[in-house]
Amino acid sequence: MIEETEEPAEGFEKFYLYRMIRENWSWFNDETYVDTLNPAAIRRFVEVTHEAYAKCVGDEFGRTVPAIFTDEPQFFFKSVLKFSRERKDVILPYTDDLPDTYRAAYGAEFLPTLPELIWELPGGAWSLARYRYHDHVAERFASAFADTIGEWCEAHNLRLT
């Protein structure tokens, strides 16, 4: 990687990486989708939503209200560039501390692996960096979203669907 002010070596090109928060969208009541990889964001989501349910109908949890339905929780899909000269935006699921938690999980830096996440390797070769990225993002989602909401539901005598 080079600094923004540096020029690439001959035969190489400069690509830019931006961390962006998705724009507000009418599908989500003119808000952005919650960061399902971020435990603090999900705890706040539970405070705003599930705690409101508990105030209104909490006495019926486990009886008249046996479960909470969660409709297709997700994180952003990952896109790739299939050809070295392809020019389009690429989206990668990301959260603020991903480089730190990736380093803690694998003893490796995240940012230098970005080319393997963005471009297909020649001949369809297998990528350890890509495997680790998907494994880590899936684990982040499971621990931040599923565990947080699942534990809240269990503590409130609710099933989670």
Question: Residue locations for each model-derived region?
Answer:
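Active-site acidic/histidine clusters and adjacent loop/turn architecture
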Residues: 146
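Beta-sheet entry/capping signal
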Residues: 14, 63-68, 150-152, 157-161
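Mature extracytoplasmic enzyme cores
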Residues: 1-131, 138-139, 143
